[in-house]
Regions:
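A contiguous, well-ordered beta/alpha segment that forms the leading edge of an enzyme domain
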Residues: 1-109
Length: 109
């Protein structure tokens, strides 16, 4: 069984193409629904264009990283590691407006 779904998120379209020989249609649709919801949650948490996202709140100093979700904290830590690994060539804290992990998040998600 194969299921393909186009998901509008992150200012683009993501294609979910799921194939399974071991799941029935209901289970496969449910799994794809979960993936789609994860993408929407990533957009809600990480968007620099949504004023109520956790990243936007971090950028404005309205919350501390310790108060963010586990996923946001994981991405923050990955960004710190990537900054160290690239000797500062990748630095989401140098973005205009402050912390912008977009370059890492789309690959991470």
């Amino acid at each position: 069984m194969r299921l393909e779904r186009l998901v509008e998120t992150w200012g683009t379209v993501v294609v979910i193409d799921a194939t399974s020989s071991g799941l029935d249609e209901v289970a496969l649709v449910s799994a794809v629904d979960e993936v789609e919801e994860f993408f929407f949650q990533v957009d809600r948490d990480f968007s620099t264009y949504k004023s109520d996202s956790q990243v936007s709140r971090l950028r404005r100093g309205e919350m501390k990283i310790e108060d963010a979700t586990e996923y946001v904290q994981q991405v923050w830590a990955l960004c710190e590691y990537a900054r160290e690994l690239t000797l500062g060539a990748f630095d989401p804290w140098k973005a205009e407006g402050g912390f912008d992990p977009s370059g890492l998040v789309k690959g991470w998600a």
